[in-house]
Amino acid sequence: MANTKHIIIVGAGPGGLCAGMLLSQRGFKVSIFDKHAEIGGRNRPINMNGFTFDTGPTFLLMKGVLDEMFELCERRSEDYLEFLPLSPMYRLLYDDRDIFVYSDRENMRAELQRVFDEGTDGYEQFMEQERKRFNALYPCITRDYSSLKSFLSLDLIKALPWLAFPKSVFNNLGQYFNQEKMRLAFCFQSKYLGMSPWECPALFTMLPYLEHEYGIYHVKGGLNRIAAAMAQVIAENGGEIHLNSEIESLIIENGAAKGVKLQHGAELRGDEVIINADFAHAMTHLVKPGVLKKYTPENLKQREYSCSTFMLYLGLDKIYDLPHHTIVFAKDYTTNIRNIFDNKTLTDDFSFYVQNASASDDSLAPAGKSALYVLVPMPNNDSGLDWQAHCQNVREQVLDTLGARLGLSDIRAHIECEKIITPQTWETDEHVYKGATFSLSHKFSQMLYWRPHNRFEELANCYLVGGGTHPGSGLPTIYESARISAKLISQKHRVRFKDIAHSAWLKKAKA
């Protein structure tokens, strides 16, 4: 008997597209709505004067997760996407030295010895112990926690020691590395979660392990091509994606999500609703006041959120001699982190990330030119900063710092086009609550069972995907949130869904 159930998805970001792909493959009727003119949400492209930039994510970590999502749709990711493994993965620049980071163990050992002269025993211990942590925790991270019973599982109880509570990532790395700068090489990844390495829970020490074990990839054309590939699968399966279609509100009757109302007034009803919009924004803008009892506007305002970012996308008439990825640490990294997360103030000495993707991918800019992407972590909008007043000053500081730290002293003369996104525009234009680009903070009290559930606990027939639900922020975990919600919906309607326990990638990880 044909499956006639209709799934409405709010947002064509990575989570919404992945869920749409998985569900349309299983015969569900899928309708996705997004306010933008392009698919992808924060994974969409920015196109300017022949230059292409990724709006948000630029690192493809845990490629096996993405591969599995396509496998669950009886497809191969490589038939839709061209993957480019990066070696080195990235360059880290301190005030007094730099290091190229490799997933190749031999090259990595040589670099660590060259730069830190500390030996490589700690690195080997790190790889061995964090492999064990990953194997213990990954099955727990990728399961549903929609009920207390599902939370109190034997797997999680067995894995509790690997949470290393209440240690932070930075402190946890002390068992492997003595030098602070050596630890920074293995804990800056907390930025993927928008957190300080001194606050980020120790379980996330497995993030750098995953980089070193499985590598980092670029996708030809930018990571936005992943969104395009998922949209193609949805179309092949008969699903629909409606762009320039902003949702005004959810249709809620008797405590259940029944559909959506579009801004132009049209209403669409379905059997299940998946929310891929920023969680806190959706709860405060798409749900009428008084409906929610747990995630009220007052409750959401009091929760902890990630940092924000200042983004500078530069179309240049030259190609600089820079690696694909460069991370530059502030000269006083501790103070920089404190200013972002505690003081919520601006500083002249900041850390930043530069993607020079044209070094690896000639499809992103006209011949002889380059698309340069610059990300500067900033306080979220709890800071109260007036970004209209600060925007140009920060831009000038960023360009000055690119010259001082990376040698791009002539960069102003080579800018053909540019776009800026501030913490304020993240909130006003992109509908990111408080401009917190990595959503709710990933502290323990906002993770697992205590993060908004994939089967949303306040509304029947409503499911969540994206960084604001379990497992959390970052492309691989967002894809996992889509898998969890798609599986829950499939089980509800008695449609078979392959379990992650059968995953070839996970078996490989355990080898």
From Swiss-Prot:
One of its GO terms (molecular function) is 4,4'-diapophytoene desaturase (4,4'-diaponeurosporene-forming). It catalyses: 15-cis-4,4'-diapophytoene + 4 FAD + 4 H(+) = all-trans-4,4'-diapolycopene + 4 FADH2. It comes from the Bacteria. Its EC number is 1.3.8.2. The keyword Phosphoprotein does not apply. Disruption phenotype: Cells lacking this gene accumulate the colorless C30 carotenoid precursor 4,4'-diapophytoene. Pathway: Carotenoid biosynthesis. The keyword Nucleotide-binding does not apply. Pfam families: Amino_oxidase. NCBIfam families: crtI_fam. Belongs to the carotenoid/retinoid oxidoreductase family. Involved in the biosynthesis of C30 carotenoids. Catalyzes four successive dehydrogenation reactions that lead to the introduction of four double bonds into 4,4'-diapophytoene (dehydrosqualene) to yield 4,4'-diapolycopene. PANTHER family: PHYTOENE DESATURASE (PTHR43734:SF1). This is 4,4'-diapophytoene desaturase (4,4'-diapolycopene-forming).
